């Protein structure tokens, strides 16, 4: 079955508008590449590579972008200087593409900063992009999913992060990788907004959310495959070996429930209730998932990623 572009675009637009009508600000986590959605196109026939551009054209006058970067990527001692130069140049081009596509200069949010660990490199990174005209913000290291909520939602934790001032209602929270800290960025903002009487909320834009009860469904396997592709693309094979996307999803749901309960706001019962309009899967999607897995197995020279993709393929 060919993907109905106009229906999906209309439904997502309506749901975002509905969520915006109930709050002062909506922090919308955007899954995957915020510039090019061709990875989704590989699994969903007819899904446009510029789907997000089409949708957010409807919100261009009331939209800001947070672009999240892992502090660990800046501080990785195993990276050579040549890699750093390429990373800096790549980010410069990528941020410019975001600005051109969404009509706004993104905020850069550095997540997981440890001020006792090579902070001079983080400061160098900040200074470089500030000189390019970007606003750069700091979010500090915490173990968000293991920390008690009363401690996390305090002046010593989320309250100690930079509170990013925004003038628009819709804030897209993007990042290069699944580990860039998008959820905790949104949560810290919501906590700090509440402290100054701004009502804000969280939602997630993900065409293939990983929350089915059947752990071996095509949807869940597709979500895991795309997650592995993104991590491998940016050289994060060290994360891949012990990666379990479904456990991560469950961790996030537990965190969100506790987070909303602590703020005395009713939390949705299921992770899909945070997600903006999921796409239904059919038999054709199984075929496409198998095809993508086989392509990645043949393409990669990483034993870790090959093993992971073979494990996923064997589940179908």
Please place each PLM-identified region on the residue numbering.
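Flexible phosphate-sensing "switch/lid" loops adjacent to ATP/NTP-binding sites
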Residues: 1-174, 179, 189-316
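Hydrophobic positions on the alpha1 helix immediately C-terminal to the Walker A/P-loop
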Residues: 184-185
């Amino acid at each position: 079955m060919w993907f109905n572009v106009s229906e999906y675009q209309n439904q997502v637009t309506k749901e975002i508008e509905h969520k915006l009508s109930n709050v002062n600000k909506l922090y919308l986590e955007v899954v995957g590449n915020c510039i090019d959605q061709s990875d989704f196109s590989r699994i969903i026939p007819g899904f446009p590579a510029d789907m997000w551009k089409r949708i957010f054209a409807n919100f261009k006058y009331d939209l800001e972008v947070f672009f999240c970067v892992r502090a660990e990527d800046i501080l990785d001692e195993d990276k050579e200087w040549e890699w750093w130069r390429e990373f800096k140049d790549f980010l410069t081009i990528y941020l410019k593409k975001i600005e051109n596509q969404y009509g706004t200069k993104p905020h850069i949010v550095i997540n997981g900063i440890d001020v006792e660990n090579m902070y001079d490199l983080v400061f160098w990174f900040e200074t470089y992009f500030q000189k390019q005209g970007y606003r750069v913000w700091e979010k500090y290291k915490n173990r968000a999913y293991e920390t008690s909520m009363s401690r996390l939602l305090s002046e010593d934790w989320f309250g100690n992060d930079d509170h990013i001032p925004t003038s628009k209602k819709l804030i897209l929270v993007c990042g290069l990788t699944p580990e860039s800290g998008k959820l905790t960025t949104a949560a810290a903002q919501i906590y700090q907004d509440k402290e100054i009487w701004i009502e804000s909320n969280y939602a997630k834009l993900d065409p293939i959310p990983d929350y089915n009860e059947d752990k071996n469904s095509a949807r869940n396997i597709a979500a895991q495959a795309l997650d592995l592709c993104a991590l491998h693309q940016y050289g994060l094979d060290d994360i891949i070996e012990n990666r379990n996307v479904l456990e991560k999803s469950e961790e996030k749901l537990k965190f969100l429930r506790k987070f909303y309960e602590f703020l005395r706001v009713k939390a949705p019962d299921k992770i899909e209730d945070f997600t903006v309009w999921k796409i239904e899967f059919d038999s054709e999607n199984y075929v496409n998932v198998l095809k993508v897995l086989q392509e990645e197995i043949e393409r990669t020279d990483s034993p870790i990623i090959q093993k992971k993709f073979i494990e996923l393929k064997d589940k179908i």
